[in-house]
């Protein structure tokens, strides 16, 4: 048993130039874990609270000194002397100490940073790579898989300053046999997409997640540009590369009139009409996964969408489920969607994140591990994806070091597992009903 001997919180800067919380947890023997909390732009209303200072004289009110103070004081005092490998106990101590349903006293950003730093320190004390330690915490020691990347190569919505309503247009290199090959395919398509956009006189500046953010006449135009890029890269769309979208529908849903208002192309849809709009895109392009295809509160709309599309493609709940087992349980019981997006800052601790992944898998749902639009160099989600054998990961495009850091960690993990004679299987999309 290695006891926690020091806990340090600090304010650092994320990929959008906003502050976030970093935590250091020190154990006996000199073992140290360092972790930082990510931050979202389009957020579900039922996410755990990200505590900001609100002091307009610092960082336009987005400082996190209150959360950092909680780490350095109340949280540190509560967990000093505890066994660093008692992850569930430590997380529960912080949850109970906070005492709110949404971690609004200390902030999910404070609790999560300490939770992850504790896991990293404990892994180091046991001489284990983080993914192996996570697998132990998950109750699945030695069970790993390399995740299929869902690469966000055209950004819209809240992730870009353009007129594209749908937030993410992604590619999935399903023809790859390894993670490293998948990244090569993704990079080649990404660079060819830059050429396609330039040839059309379109902007090749990138958005928050490293994808291009051009102004386009329609969402279908984004898919057409990607199709051209895939072909120019020498790949076959639908065989080597498939497509995915994150609609982030809550961002353009008008609660007053119940319509999905896509201002970028001047169209409005009822709930069912929007499902059929997406169905039309799926008929035209090999789209294998759609995230948040309805507003988070439109459960009737989600039920209809699941009925229409759920047997054909992956329907991922992000704002819908917010990595929360209570909400996911209700969704499973009602047959809503067939997959959950996993963002550990939505719930605020590693223990609760693992519980959500387990609940999803036990119900036959897939779990997609995800970054946030505000990230740091922290690559914990790479280890989380491998250690839970989740099978899929969303961590942005092939640019911006805050995104590429996760891909590079996956390369290292794949290499290490192969060198140990235990190569991990690849491509979790095959688990989805209706997929090849």
From Swiss-Prot:
EC number: 4.2.1.11
Catalytic reaction list: (2R)-2-phosphoglycerate = phosphoenolpyruvate + H2O
Residues annotated as catalytic: 209 (proton donor), 343 (proton acceptor)
Keywords: Cytoplasm, Glycolysis, Lyase, Magnesium, Metal-binding, Secreted
Subcellular location: Cytoplasm; Secreted; Cell surface
CDD domains: enolase (cd03313)
Binding site for Mg(2+): 246, 291, 318
Listed transmembrane segments: none
Highest taxon above the source species: Bacteria
GO BP, sorted A to Z: glycolytic process
Cofactor comment text: Binds a second Mg(2+) ion via substrate during catalysis.
Secretion signal span: none
SUPFAM superfamilies on file: Enolase C-terminal domain-like, Enolase N-terminal domain-like
Binding-site residues, (2R)-2-phosphoglycerate: 167, 343, 372-373, 394
InterPro entries reported for this sequence: Enolase (IPR000941), Enolase-like_C_sf (IPR036849), Enolase-like_N (IPR029017), Enolase_C (IPR020810), Enolase_CS (IPR020809), Enolase_N (IPR020811)
Protein's pathway: Carbohydrate degradation; glycolysis; pyruvate from D-glyceraldehyde 3-phosphate: step 4/5
Enzyme class, broadest EC rank: lyase
Function as written in the Swiss-Prot or TrEMBL entry: Catalyzes the reversible conversion of 2-phosphoglycerate (2-PG) into phosphoenolpyruvate (PEP). It is essential for the degradation of carbohydrates via glycolysis.
Protein family per UniProt: Belongs to the enolase family.
Protein's recorded name: Enolase
Organism: Actinobacillus pleuropneumoniae serotype 3 (strain JL03)
Lineage of producing organism: Bacteria, Pseudomonadati, Pseudomonadota, Gammaproteobacteria, Pasteurellales
């Amino acid at each position: 048993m290695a006891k926690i001997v020091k806990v340090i919180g600090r304010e650092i800067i994320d990929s959008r130039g906003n502050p976030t919380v970093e935590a250091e947890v020190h154990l006996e023997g000199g073992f140290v874990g360092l972790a930082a909390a990510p931050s979202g732009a389009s957020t579900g209303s039922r996410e755990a609270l990200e505590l900001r200072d609100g002091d307009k004289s610092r960082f336009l009110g987005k400082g996190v000194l209150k959360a950092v103070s909680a780490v350095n004081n109340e949280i540190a005092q509560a967990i000093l002397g505890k066994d660093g490998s008692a992850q569930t106990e430590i997380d529960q101590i912080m949850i109970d100490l906070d005492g709110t349903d949404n971690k609004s006293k200390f902030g999910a950003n404070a609790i999560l940073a300490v939770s992850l730093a504790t896991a990293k320190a404990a892994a180091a004390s046991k001489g284990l790579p983080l993914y192996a330690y996570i697998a132990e915490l998950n109750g699945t020691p030695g069970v790993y898989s390399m995740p299929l990347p869902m690469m966000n190569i055209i950004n819209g919505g809240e992730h870009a300053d353009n007129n594209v309503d749908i937030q993410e247009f992604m590619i999935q290199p399903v023809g790859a046999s390894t993670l490293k090959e998948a990244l090569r395919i993704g990079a080649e398509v990404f660079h060819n997409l830059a050429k396609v956009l330039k040839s059309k006189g379109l902007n090749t500046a990138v958005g928050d997640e490293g994808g291009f953010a051009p102004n386009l006449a329609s969402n279908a135009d984004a898919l057409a540009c990607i199709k051209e890029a895939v072909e120019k890269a020498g790949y076959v769309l639908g065989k080597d590369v498939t497509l995915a979208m994150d609609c982030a529908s809550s961002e353009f849903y008008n609660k007053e009139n119940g319509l999905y208002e896509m201002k970028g192309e001047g169209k409005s849809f009822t709930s069912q009409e929007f499902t059929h709009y997406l169905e039309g895109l799926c008929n035209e392009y090999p789209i294998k996964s759609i995230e948040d295809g309805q507003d988070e509160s439109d459960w009737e709309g989600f039920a209809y969408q699941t009925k229409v599309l759920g047997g054909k493609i992956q329907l991922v709940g992000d704002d819908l489920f917010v990595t929360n087992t209570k909400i996911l349980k209700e969704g499973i019981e009602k047959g809503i969607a067939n997959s959950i997006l996993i963002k550990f800052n939505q719930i605020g601790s590693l223990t609760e994140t693992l519980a959500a992944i387990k609940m999803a898998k036990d119900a036959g749902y897939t779990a997609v591990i995800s970054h946030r639009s505000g990230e740091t160099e922290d690559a914990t989600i790479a280890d989380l994806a491998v250690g839970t054998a989740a099978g899929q990961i969303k961590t942005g495009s092939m640019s911006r070091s805050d995104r590429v850091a996760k891909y590079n960690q996956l390369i290292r993990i794949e290499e290490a597992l192969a060198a140990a004679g235990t190569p991990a299987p690849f491509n979790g999309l095959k688990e989805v009903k209706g997929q090849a």
